[in-house]
Amino acid sequence: MDSLITAAALALAGGDPLGALDRVALREDPPALALRGIAMAQLGDLDRAKALLRRAARGFGPKEAVARARCVVAEAEIALVSRDLGWPAKALDAARATLEKHGDRLNAAHAGHLKVRRLLLIGRLDEAEDVLGGLDPMPLPPASRAAHELAVAGIAMRRLK
């Protein structure tokens, strides 16, 4: 990873999408496109974000399966935020499997949580509970653990009806 990509990724992680865009706005390589897509999503331009993430995923080579999978997860998150529940769940499952296979536990867990949230939105409580049961929240950072507990609470609330 070159220094501009690293700096842009750190800016995004620190909540500075404009700083990230400053570093990669004119670049067309797949890592830059992916970071631009994430930055645009953080800024609320979801259509452009999806397009950039798709271009990035197509641009990553066969040896960059993890990068492609991360793009799929990011695109799935955008679809969920947009309430586009018709996005391909199989693509998210495949991305999650790839991430798990390559040891990216954090992004694999995030993909699992996205699947759970989608299943909750479409009313498939049993499936959501099954997926959630397979996710271990302990090694996750606090924000991801909180998302896990919110999903558990969401299932419990729907079961009360």
Give short role names for the model-derived ranges.
Residues 17-18, 46, 85, 105, ...:
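TPR-repeat structural position
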Residues 2, 31, 38, 68-70, ...:
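Residue register of alpha-helical TPR repeats
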Residues 14, 43, 82, 102, ...:
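Structural motif corresponding to the intra-repeat A-B loop/turn of tetratricopeptide repeats
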Residues 21, 28, 54-60, 93-103, ...:
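Amphipathic alpha-helical segments of tetratricopeptide repeats
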Residues 2-23:
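Alpha-helical segment of the N-proximal tetratricopeptide repeat
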Residues 10, 39, 78, 118, ...:
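Residue-level signature for tetratricopeptide repeat
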